[in-house]
Amino acid sequence: MDLVGADAWIRDHVEPIGGIETEHERPWATVLRVPLAGGAAWFKACAPVQAFEPRLTAELFSRYPDRVAEVLGHDEERAWLLLGDAGTPIGTFGNPPETWLVALPLYAELQRGEVAHTLDHLAHGVPDLRVATLPARYDDLLRPDVPLEREEIDRLRAFAPRFEELCDELVAHDVAETVQHDDLHMANVYTEGGKLRVLDWGDSSISHPFVSLVVTFRFLEEVTELPPGDPWFARLRDAYLEPWGRGLEEVFALAMRVGAFAHAIAWLRQRDHLSAMERSEFDRGFRTVLRRAIAQTL
């Protein structure tokens, strides 16, 4: 990353009161903390695999300024993004499911509004994971370099015809596809002054909207330790579905099943942009994602 250029660009937009520091470096993005008189701003330099994020975030902020972080500046060509401080991640409070009762309908309303902008997002590089494209992408999960045991890959291979049927069923329900975050968990939803904001749109895609909750529900299981079948999941599902209309519970269940595979396919896309050394660490989390998909073959 061009640190000198980034420093100058940041100072064109805000007035730091101290040194700009690296918050974290990842293969897909570098984040810098910019101290300001009133708090902090956050600079993000996105890798090519997530180069669409600055424009997408700016577009969302222009339409939903109360639901995403304030965009202080963005540079599409260099894939740079400067955000205002959004408060505190809800994970700081232990990922309470009560907060998701509020966050999920707000997020669903954003998704519904973005249906009108789907083709524009695709034209500007947001990954295309529309359900009709997934069966052709499914074969990528069977590659020999995927970090699974042979018998696990065999299970995925045997499930391929059924997966195509499930995708066809989901498409037939005709729920409009739109932007979906694909990393919607407690570290990416922030709270401040009674507002909830969704951050970090770099894993987003255009897909079935309901698949977003694959990640949300996974973290409620793993972090909040809600057992599968806990009544909270039905309450949160219903809260999310309310802006979409009535009678969608079966469609939601189908989308969650298909979504487990879509999420794995999205992870594979990220993996393909990593070095061999970076893949070794990445694969520890990827195995979990893959095995949650394999569980849907039963």
Specify the residue positions occupied by each region the protein language model found:
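Juxta-kinase regulatory segment immediately upstream of eukaryotic protein kinase catalytic domains
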Residues: 1-18
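Active-site acidic catalytic loop and adjacent metal/ATP-binding pocket
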Residues: 21-36, 42-43, 71, 164-213
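ATP-binding pocket architecture of kinase catalytic cores
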Residues: 23-24, 28-127
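A general structural signal marking secondary-structure boundaries and capping sites
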Residues: 64, 111-118, 145, 220, ...
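Active-site activation/catalytic loop segments of kinase-like enzymes and analogous catalytic loops
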Residues: 196, 209-245, 257-276
